[in-house]
Every structure is written in C-alpha cells, then in structure tokens.
Amino acid sequence: MPKKFQGENTKSAAARARRAEAKAAADAKKQKELEDAYWRDEDKHVMRKEQRKEEKEKRRLEQLERKKETQRLLEEEDSKLKGGKAPRVAASSKVTRAQIEETLRRDHQHKESPDPAEKAKSHLEVPLEENVNRRVLEEGSVEARTIEDAIAVLSVTEEAVDRHPERRMRAAYTAFEEAQLPRLKQENPNMRLSQLKQMLKKEWLRSPDNPMNQRAVPFNTPK
C-alpha cells in the first residue's frame, strides 16, 4: 500500500493565496471608499458650518446698522424737539418761516407802494403761489392757502409734535433696550434672554423714557 502524500498541494496553496490577496484588495478598496465618503461628509459639514457662520455675521452687521440708524433718527428727532424746530413732513411744496416772513415783508411794501395795475386789489385778494404750504401731519393734512393759514400752521406745529407719542414708541423702545439690556444681563447673569426681555418690558412700562408715559396733547385742544 502506497504512503499518503504528506506535503502541501502547491495548486491549493496558490489558490488560497490568490483568494486571500483578492479579499485583501477588496477590503482595502471598501475601506478607502468608506474613508472617502467620510471626508466628503466632513467637508460638507465644514462648508455648512462656515456658511451658517457667514450668515450669522451678516445678520449681526445688518442688525447693528438698523440700530445705528434708529439711534440716529431718534437723536435727530430729539434735537429738533429741543431746538424748537418743526418736524420734517412729507409735502408737495413747503413754506418755511423765513419764506412766510419774506412774503409778509413784500406784502407790506406792496401796500405802501402798490403797482398801478394792482391798485384795485387788496393783499387779501392776491392769492399766494399755488400750494404754498401743505403740511402733512400724523393725523391728517393741513393746507395753508393764505398768509394767515401759513402762520397758524407754524404756530401749532410745536403743539402737534407730541400729540401722538405712540408714533415714536418703536424707536424709543429700541434705544431703551440698547441702553438697559446690558445692565440687566450684568445684574442677572443666570437668566435667559427671554426672561431679561420680560424684565426690560416691565421697566419700560414705568420708564419716563416711554412716550406713552408722557402727557399726550389731545388733537382738538383749543389754544
């Protein structure tokens, strides 16, 4: 009886080696695909993060600009009120105090030495320039078609400034919030922003800076 072959079959060994090599190559390829997919996802995540950061910064700058513009408008309005100036109003044509005084002066000169062609007319019969003054107030519009009307408009302007303080509520509250919110944050560091804003609104209701706490002048108040 012949002896069994004790050595390794070279063909079987070669086949196993090829299978192992193919499996290793397949595993390496799969691992590379997984790594590539991971880095692609990571890149997308980084890009989204950067995009959100840029959008947040853009919103912050826009909000800062709006606050600056609101503060500028509020300071401009306060400056006009302190200086006794009439507020700017939309109108198709405006008459300033200087123009009215100039019109009165010319009218006075005209009465003293009238033109021969105008002797038959009094200064009240000579109309002013069309739409000489049209002042659009917050409650409506007031037109000055004569010198007397124009003077009356100027005389009631200062009274009309604060008849409706609620018109300035939004700008005043924004300025109040910018001034007081940092103080509340410092005094209450553990509170959330929503809680701080609730406290701020309560202070605003009692604040003398609140236009609603200032005495409002009725629209038809007699002089």
Curated annotation (Swiss-Prot):
One of its GO terms (molecular function) is transcription coactivator activity. Keywords: Cell cycle, Cell division, Coiled coil, Cytoplasm, Cytoskeleton, Phosphoprotein. One of its GO terms (cellular component) is cytoplasm. Residues 18-74, 99-126 have a biased composition (Basic and acidic residues). The modification Phosphoserine is found at residues 141, 194. It holds the Pfam family Ccdc124. The keyword Cell division applies. It is found in: Cytoplasm, Cytoskeleton, Microtubule organizing center, Centrosome; Midbody. Its main location: cytoplasm. Residues 15-82 form a coiled coil. InterPro entries: Ccdc124/Oxs1, Ccdc124/Oxs1_C, HMG_box_dom_sf. Residues 1-126 are annotated as: Disordered. The keyword rRNA processing does not apply. GO terms for biological process: cell division; transcription by RNA polymerase II. It comes from the Eukaryota. Ribosome-binding protein involved in ribosome hibernation: associates with translationally inactive ribosomes and stabilizes the nonrotated conformation of the 80S ribosome, thereby promoting ribosome preservation and storage. Also required for proper progression of late cytokinetic stages. Associates with translationally inactive ribosomes in the nonrotated state. Interacts with RASGEF1B. This is Coiled-coil domain-containing protein 124. The lineage of its organism: Eukaryota, Metazoa, Chordata, Craniata, Vertebrata.
